[in-house]
Amino acid sequence: MSTTDSIVSSQTKQSSWRKSDTTWTLGLFGTAIGAGVLFFPIRAGFGGLIPILLMLVLAYPIAFYCHRALARLCLSGSNPSGNITETVEEHFGKTGGVVITFLYFFAICPLLWIYGVTITNTFMTFWENQLQMPALNRGVVALFLLLLMAFVIWFGKDLMVKVMSYLVWPFIASLVLISLSLIPYWNSAVIDQVDLSNIALTGHDGILVTVWLGISIMVFSFNFSPIVSSFVVSKREEYEKEFGRDFTERKCSQIISRASMLMVAVVMFFAFSCLFTLSPQNMADAKAQNIPVLSYLANHFASLSGTKSTFATVLEYGASIIALVAIFKSFFGHYLGTLEGLNGLVLKFGYKGDKTKVSMGKLNTISMIFIMGSTWIVAYANPNILDLIEAMGAPIIASLLCLLPMYAIRKAPSLAKYRGRLDNVFVTLIGLLTILNIVYKLF
């Protein structure tokens, strides 16, 4: 083979799309599509048609640029097999490692609290509205559901992980199917409410504030940051030795881009389908009732007068069941991350990092009691889920997903080539706007 043929062959091999790339594209996509998606239509549709159209424009840039920034941070470490904690420690020392451990824990733990509230409300709504049963005590329901999940986690962790992986695709398929099935019920209410002469840009209900608050729920819903570190390590081990780090970075960016496109297409279609079926007032009611949009849809179809179609009856029951399954799936997935993070913190500060001083069983028990206990307290208190996402969940995710990579790009020599780019300004702005939601909630 001539030198030219060798070069052409090498270039073809480099540019080819591998099966593993498709697997990771779907993996990133599947990680993001969870219970958080069930709240996005409520916040997105709350302000009517114009804000959700602006969110549609912002959705892909937020998903792609923010996750690409985190991937670049993970790629910047000298060890191809090093995870994000090792990379941050390499750039900023042991203190950086402690900070990232705290960030990971506090980025995931509030999500468990959110899911604890959600699963309690969804179950009680299904019990009272679809099954027509008498109301139950909230504290007892929350305790029962959490003990049930704790039992499954304690005695069947491996089975739980396997079942979770099987649930991802049926859930995504059900979202697409519901979105399509709602089309016959679309109406023009959301379009009829658009009055260009009375549109307010500022103020409590203005378009800018609505979109600003919507950015938080987008950061929360379009989030696959927990898996980015593992994804980058896998791609570095696959590509870096043969093709170099620059090629690996381009390949990671390409995969993140395709995953973001899939994610935005599915979630935004679902949001628009819900909005055209319901109305901004319905979305406000769903927020006030503190339930996911599928539960509200179930109640909406249950309240239809006259003879209901078979689909309406199926959706009335199916939507709540799908919501429950989605929340269980998301709770289990985030529990594993929370447990790992809390175990690390307890080990680091309680036992000075000495694994010989405590058994893994005892460590898991201590962490489980704290996690389930705190989740039960929050579930019983029943704070508004969207407010909790905007004030706690999304800002912590944004600090990890947006601001940490931007700080690293400014400080770490290995990331110097990414300085001075316009997309850095965009990612920083998204991170700051999301965190500033905390200030907005205070006033």
UniProtKB/Swiss-Prot annotation:
It is a multi-pass membrane protein. The chain crosses the membrane at residues 22-42, 44-64, 97-117, 140-160, 163-183, 207-227, 259-279, 319-339, 366-386, 389-409, 423-443. It is found in: Cell inner membrane. GO terms for molecular function: L-serine transmembrane transporter activity; symporter activity; threonine efflux transmembrane transporter activity. It catalyses: L-threonine(in) + H(+)(in) = L-threonine(out) + H(+)(out); L-serine(in) + H(+)(in) = L-serine(out) + H(+)(out). Pfam families: Trp_Tyr_perm. The keyword DNA repair does not apply. Keywords: Amino-acid transport, Cell inner membrane, Cell membrane, Membrane, Symport, Transmembrane, Transmembrane helix, Transport. Its main location: membrane. InterPro entries: Amino_acid_transport_2, Hydroxy_aa_transpt, Thr/Ser_transpt_TdcC. One of its GO terms (cellular component) is plasma membrane. PANTHER family: SERINE TRANSPORTER, THREONINE_SERINE TRANSPORTER TDCC. Involved in the import of threonine and serine into the cell, with the concomitant import of a proton (symport system). Belongs to the amino acid/polyamine transporter 2 family. SdaC/TdcC subfamily. This is Threonine/serine transporter TdcC. It comes from Salmonella arizonae (strain ATCC BAA-731 / CDC346-86 / RSK2980). The gene is tdcC.
